[in-house]
Each structure stands twice: as C-alpha cells, then as structure tokens.
A protein has these predicted regions:
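Short, polar/acidic, helix-capping and beta-turn segments at strand->helix junctions
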Residues: 1-159
C-alpha cells in the first residue's frame, strides 16, 4: 500500500513529510485494541508551520491547504508507527480543530482538505467519521490541528 500511496501523492504534487516529534509531554501515537490513535498534528508547508486565524488573517483556501498538510503529517505518523502503511485498514475518525475568528463558520469546508486527501489516498477505506470544531487559539498559533483514529491489522508477534 505504501508504494501506491507514494505514487498517488506524486500525482497530486505532494510528498510525505518526516513524522514530527512531539512538542510537549505526549507520544505521537498509541496502538491499542486494533486501533492506532494519533495525537493532534499541525500543518507544515515546506518546513514552515502554517499559522493564523481563519476569518481574520487567513482565508478558507489557506485553511483547506493547512488541513491537507495536517493529513499528510497524520499519514507520516502512521508510516512511522507501523513501519509502513501495509497495516492500515481504514481511517475511522478525524478530529479537526480550526483556529477561527468568532464569525468564521466554514470549519467543515476547511476539514474537507484532510477528508478529501484521505479518500484520495486510501479509497473507500479513507472515508471516515469526523468532527470539525472552531477554536479561538491553537498551540503555536497553528491554523489547524487534526488528530485521528485508524483501524489497523495485527502486526507481527501480535497476540
């Protein structure tokens, strides 16, 4: 599956970044009960954090791209945690947090940046449940933060 996703990313003009290290006292992923829980990931574009508040100093297109970059980081975390993407069975849920001005109400459209990329990469297995929430501030002034729950196949040596 990893090769197919790498090809699809190339067709889209995208590439997986290196999985980001945690910025505080947590781990990036936890595998439990056939699920991989992925901590909130921030959007990076060419190594720079995508910052700002949607509806104030950033527009919907910027938010969409930021959500897409968060999704890329989620896939990078899957690959790092699982040693590839071969164990990914389906994307179960995304939790999307959008740094929003009080009158910005297009959080679902921002979240589509991540949702549409997951469907492009994983097909029907990439279609997922989702929350899209506006918040007044995010860590490091990030424009978007997304966490995920992913169903995975048992790994080698699993009981």
């Amino acid at each position: 599956m990893t090769d197919r996703i790498d090809r699809k990313l190339g067709e889209l003009g995208l590439a997986l970044p290196q999985a980001a290290a945690p910025v505080a006292a947590y781990v990036p992923t936890v595998e439990a009960g056939g699920l991989l829980h992925i901590s909130g990931q921030l959007p990076f574009d060419e190594g720079a954090l995508m910052t700002g508040r949607l509806g104030a100093d950033r527009d919907l297109d910027y938010g969409y791209r930021a959500a897409q970059r968060c999704a890329l980081m989620l896939v990078a975390q899957m690959k790092a945690a699982l040693g590839g993407l071969h164990r990914v069975e389906r994307i179960v849920k995304l939790g999307v947090f959008v740094n929003s001005a009080a009158d910005f109400t297009d959080q679902p459209k921002v979240a589509n940046g991540a949702s549409e990329l997951m469907a492009e990469l994983f097909g029907d297995a990439g279609r997922h449940a989702r929350s899209a929430v506006g918040v007044p501030v995010l860590p490091l002034n990030a424009a978007v933060e997304i966490d995920a729950i992913v169903q995975i196949a048992p790994g080698e040596g699993a009981v």
